[in-house]
Amino acid sequence: MDRERLTHLQQLEAESIHIIREVAAEFENPVMMYSIGKDSSVMLHLARKAFYPGKIPFPLLHVDTDWKFKEMIKFRDETARKYGLDLIVHKNPDGLAMGINPFVHGSGKHTDIMKTEGLKQALNKYGFDAAFGGARRDEEKSRAKERVYSFRDKSHRWDPKNQRPELWRVYNSQVNKGESIRVFPLSNWTELDIWQYIYLENIDIVPLYFAAMRPVVERNGIKIMVDDERMPIGPEDEVKQELVRFRTLGCYPLTGAIESAATTLPEIIEEMLLTTSSERQGRLIDHDQAGSMEQKKRQGYF
């Protein structure tokens, strides 16, 4: 079918499926990062479509920091069982031994050790030469300038000044031994595209995306959900039950909730049409310092 006859979402879907199939054909040992969020759910759905009725020909990898929302872990395990996924879960053993804690050590150190170093450990351990990620260009300025095929050196570092041209949807997959590519099939999607596609395709997502009464503590203007007993509650903290949901998901101490009454997908989509703020405003790791996301990516972060 001609691209001109496809709807906007059908064009995005076709492009993403093309990228996923290209990587599966060109690389020896690809892996799909699975962070359990809405973008990962869409990417997994696209991968299942790309190889239907066969199984996805590569494993999924979740780098678990040990601080994800309980509902995320439950959803991850249920999804893996439901679709018979080859799911690898990796936790940085050094970070666990050191007792790295986002409340004690801060978001920067926690992210570096449990996420960046944990990811590099897993990629080295299993020898993956390509890794899919669900990042989109509309999320954040460093991601806006990153290619679909993002080259990484032997230390998994990204050099934004040394990117390969991608003309006419032709991607350069050549890497030397020890080098790798991070692949972003959802690069050209927007947050609104993601939500509309989830609605049209009836894709399961973590319930945290829907508004519900949840216990939250407000710190520095950000509502943090009290997800387990590890969260320190000081005498100045007031735990309130509020109607909130999450636009983005990560480690619960580093992810802010938003006030919302959206309990259905159409209501979330309507909310997205009216919002003027970034979905990542609630991710504390993006506010460590100016340009923090680009610095993290240079060091090997996804």
Swiss-Prot record:
Protein name: Sulfate adenylyltransferase subunit 2
Keyword Iron in annotation: no
CDD domains, alphabetized: Sulfate_adenylyltransferase_2 (cd23946)
Any one GO molecular-function label of the UniProt entry: sulfate adenylyltransferase (ATP) activity
Functional note: With CysN forms the ATP sulfurylase (ATPS) that catalyzes the adenylation of sulfate producing adenosine 5'-phosphosulfate (APS) and diphosphate, the first enzymatic step in sulfur assimilation pathway. APS synthesis involves the formation of a high-energy phosphoric-sulfuric acid anhydride bond driven by GTP hydrolysis by CysN coupled to ATP hydrolysis by CysD.
Pathway involvement of the protein, from the record: Sulfur metabolism; hydrogen sulfide biosynthesis; sulfite from sulfate: step 1/3
Family: Belongs to the PAPS reductase family. CysD subfamily.
Reaction it catalyzes: sulfate + ATP + H(+) = adenosine 5'-phosphosulfate + diphosphate
Enzyme class at the top of the EC tree: transferase
GO terms (BP aspect): hydrogen sulfide biosynthetic process; sulfate assimilation
Organism: Aeromonas hydrophila subsp. hydrophila (strain ATCC 7966 / DSM 30187 / BCRC 13018 / CCUG 14551 / JCM 1027 / KCTC 2358 / NCIMB 9240 / NCTC 8049)
Keyword ATP-binding in annotation: yes
UniProtKB keywords: ATP-binding, Nucleotide-binding, Nucleotidyltransferase, Transferase
Self-association state and partner proteins as the record states: Heterodimer composed of CysD, the smaller subunit, and CysN.
InterPro entries: PAPS_reduct_dom (IPR002500), Rossmann-like_a/b/a_fold (IPR014729), SO4_adenylTrfase_ssu (IPR011784), Sulfate_adenylyltrnsfr_sub2 (IPR050128)
EC number: 2.7.7.4
